[in-house]
């Protein structure tokens, strides 16, 4: 997972004698920016959207290390709360199945140290991912219909950008 600030992109483009002509916000995968650039001889400066976003980045302390220290503290606290709940569920001998074998979900699993001793399966509609294992955590990837085999199961949605679609599908498989 990578993300560049508009300020960092602007600086890289300036080194290549380019300027930001326009910026589009793209909703896909939780949001990203699509940046269009032109040679600086064709556009005098970065567009007003770029200047506005760079100002927002500065005002929100994006370039201050303390911002990331606080973020990490909050992240670790939330991870600990989440793990307490996951282990409580597992102590009840209930199955936990991950939904969606996306790369972002695997990053989540590895950061939370969740492996095949905690997550029983990962389901994915893609036959190209089925009958394989998640990297590092070694959780088997199976088809979505595995949900029909369980009376009681917890679903951990790992493809959260399409969670609404996945929830509907899971209810169809196992109402």
Question: Over which residues does each language-model region extend?
Answer:
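Conserved S-adenosyl-L-methionine
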Residues: 17-29
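A short, well-structured juxtamembrane/interface segment
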Residues: 74-94
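Short alpha-helix
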Residues: 1-17
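Flexible, glycine-/basic-rich loop-and-beta segments that form/coincide
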Residues: 30-74
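Short, flexible loop segments at boundaries between secondary-structure elements
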Residues: 120-134, 175
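Phosphate-bearing ligand-interacting subdomains
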Residues: 138-175
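Substrate-recognition/cap helix-loop segment adjacent to the acidic, metal-dependent catalytic center
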Residues: 107-120
